[in-house]
Amino acid sequence: MPTREELVLERIRDTPEGFVRAYGDVSPGAPRFAGTVLSANHDPDLPWWRIVRADGSLAKGARQRALLDAEGVPFRSDRVDMRIARLP
């Protein structure tokens, strides 16, 4: 049985290019745990930039924005347009 951390990492890896998930989507009921997992992970292939705050705002700023822009993620001002880009 996978650990809680492994489940979070699996959900992050399963987030396809051009879409995002909120911290609470990858760690239901414990969004801060997702942040802890991300900050402790050093896998260069983990698409960390696809995880955003529930309101679409970015935790990592300019670098995260550039990576999401390159994938065609839609924005409304400085936030991801969660109505379009958030996975159900």
Residue ranges, per PLM feature:
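Nucleic acid-binding interface residues in structured DNA/RNA-binding domains
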Residues: 1-88
